[in-house]
Amino acid sequence: MSNSANAALAGPWKDLWNGDLSLTDKIIAEDFIAYAAPITGTGPDEIRGREALKGWISGIHAVLPDLSFVIEVGPITDDEHLVVRWKAQGTYHGGFPGAPTEAIGRHVSFTGTDILRTAGGKLAEYWANTDSLLFFQQLGVREVPALGGYGS
């Protein structure tokens, strides 16, 4: 895929994370896999395929219904990769393990970097680097829940 074709996937990728799950079949490969520690507490091996990705995104939006992402840097591309640095913000509505009830209604903001590999005009692999510590601190989480798949 060309650099410009890869760059064209950045906007729809952001829109997908902003909650437009209708984009999934258009931009995500059937055998998609994410290498990430989701803030929802599931392990990385559970994020395989389109439906798992939609479930992950839906889970995050259940905790932060007004969550929105903006791309701050990028897209940076080569023949088969797309990289973006983003900022996300939203209002916590409860449901995160370990977060105190007084965190409900709190505005949170955090950043991350996504590295994606493309194949056949779609996104096939995803490596996420999210500032989860900042997210947890803003919620007042004192003990981070164990994330399956890492050191277990």
Where do the protein language model's features map onto the residues?
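C-terminal and inter-domain tail/linker signature
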Residues: 1-152
